[in-house]
């Protein structure tokens, strides 16, 4: 279990961290998007946490895509700093999506706030912000492309990995493949297509190759 929370307890425990120089310590690879908790704060150091995908663009650089109208983008634009927090705790992702985390869920590190008990975190300072309009099947939305440089990389003994949805898309596709003979071909194709979209968006070369093989095998099986 992640170091973020003790089972069935309210306040998470503090953990000790080891300092590292770059994102390689978290096994974050360039071109992959990782599911994290981004912590920001206002002028009064009131913390805000939000589940946000962070794109690794180098050993010490990341890119975030933030939607207009959120406290995260407001805080980032205001002070130009944030922390990226790694946790495997499903309740942290859930609670920070459905509402606000309590004040005691945050800890201070220098002039930054981070998620108390996170398996790892790193400080980040904004390098540039570009505003654009995103158009997709859901319509149009304003988006801020935030490029940032990682500073201090802190890792606890509880660290296992930074979440990347690509591998889960592959696993879900393999489960669907094994049930192909009992499934509606149209529904199955739609399911695999959605998983392929996820893998291509957030995964690396191996996830993309895995999906290619699954799709090829599936077509041979049901055609």
Swiss-Prot record:
UniProt-listed SUPFAM superfamilies: FMN-binding split barrel
Superkingdom to which the source organism belongs: Archaea
Short name of one Pfam family: DUF447_N
Family classification: To M.jannaschii MJ1453.
Protein name per UniProt: Uncharacterized protein MTH_863
Source species: Methanothermobacter thermautotrophicus (strain ATCC 29096 / DSM 1053 / JCM 10044 / NBRC 100330 / Delta H)
